Amino acid sequence: MKVGIVNDSALAVAALRRAIALDPAFEIVWVAGDGEQAVQLAASHTPDVILMDLLMPVMDGVEATRRIMAATPCPIVVVTTDLGRNATQVFDAMGHGAIDAVDTPTLTESDAKLTAGPLLRKMRNIGRLVAGRAAPRPAITEMPGTLAASRLVAIGASAGGPAALAKLLGALPADFCAAVVAVQHVDEAFAPGMADWLDSQCALPVRVAAPGETPQAGTVLIAGTNNHLRLLGSNRMAYTEQPSEYLYRPSIDVFFESVVEYWRGQAIGVLLTGMGRDGASGLKAMRDHGCLTIAQDQATSAVYGMPKAAAAMGAASEILPLTAIAPRLVQACCSVRPPPG
């Protein structure tokens, strides 16, 4: 797996080299000292993954991500020394198509393997994604529903998702009459900051879903751990380690499939921009179950992977530009009465 590094710090580059050397499957093919050089190298020697710093001279990582994803798209992981302090820039980069974010590994010998672990796990997942070796989806088992009838909008997003979620959720009215639950591929250390950022962009309250919480109309819940978020028959949200075979944690497919299993009110599935196929089979299960299902169109997707997979398998009953999704949700959820409980 060919790796490009974009970082102006010699110490950070040395730490990344040491971390990557722990896995012989990875090969560093170039190192860029700023975003402008990275854009040029990505165009001439496109790697399998780029490890992108944020704060650099000449051109920062956000602009470099935007240009690379527009010209020669490939998986980009933001690697920076302080995710929390650089949260705004991380969200901007993910809005332009960066697939994930992680702290820079340390160079200290005693901590090298420990701090390299999160980065290497993300890179291995990307390698499986690029190779098309995502784990097969287990069959859905129909189970008796116990949730009270209500309206639920289930949303999945990956690369480019934070910006897409901000636009979609920001266009929903404060009195939106359905519960909203979103699964965005992001590390658990970063989820609370993303929820706070989305909350500042929307009229609806946004927060990380807590174990045992019940989805409520007019509130947005965001998956907040590296386990799967799902509905259970107790009318509450839960985080579970199983199923273990899914490439992504949290998995959009797992959440969508739990909606099929347990939600007996009106449900709508929405699959936004993202790399790979996560969410496509779950969206198909929702459509087969009689739910309205929406996939973001190619023109407005930062990365047209997950919505493309959904469209190809007939999972989306409607394919819409991002700006049309919120009005469609309002029309579908708020212009009709919910089914009787």
Swiss-Prot record:
Q: How is it modified after translation?
A: Phosphorylated by CheA. Phosphorylation of the N-terminal regulatory domain activates the methylesterase activity.
Q: Which GO terms describe its cellular component?
A: cytoplasm
What is the role of the protein in this entry? Involved in chemotaxis. Part of a chemotaxis signal transduction system that modulates chemotaxis in response to various stimuli. Catalyzes the demethylation of specific methylglutamate residues introduced into the chemoreceptors (methyl-accepting chemotaxis proteins or MCP) by CheR. Also mediates the irreversible deamidation of specific glutamine residues to glutamic acid.
Q: Which SMART domains match?
A: REC
Read off the domain note: Contains a C-terminal catalytic domain, and an N-terminal region which modulates catalytic activity.
Q: Which residues form the active site?
A: 158, 185, 278
Q: Name one GO molecular function term.
A: protein-glutamate methylesterase activity
**Entry's Gene3D superfamilies?**
3.40.50.2300, Methylesterase CheB, C-terminal domain
Identification of the protein by name:
Protein-glutamate methylesterase/protein-glutamine glutaminase 1
Which top EC class applies here?
A: hydrolase
Q: What is its EC number?
A: 3.1.1.61, 3.5.1.44
The answer to keyword Phosphoprotein applying to this record is yes
Annotated compartments: Cytoplasm
Question: Which intervals hold domain CheB-type methylesterase?
Answer: 146-331
Q: Tell me where in this chain the Response regulatory domain is found.
A: 2-119
Which positions does the record annotate as the modified residue 4-aspartylphosphate? 53
Disulfide linkages recorded for this protein, renumbered to the chain, are none
Q: Which family does it belong to?
A: Belongs to the CheB family.
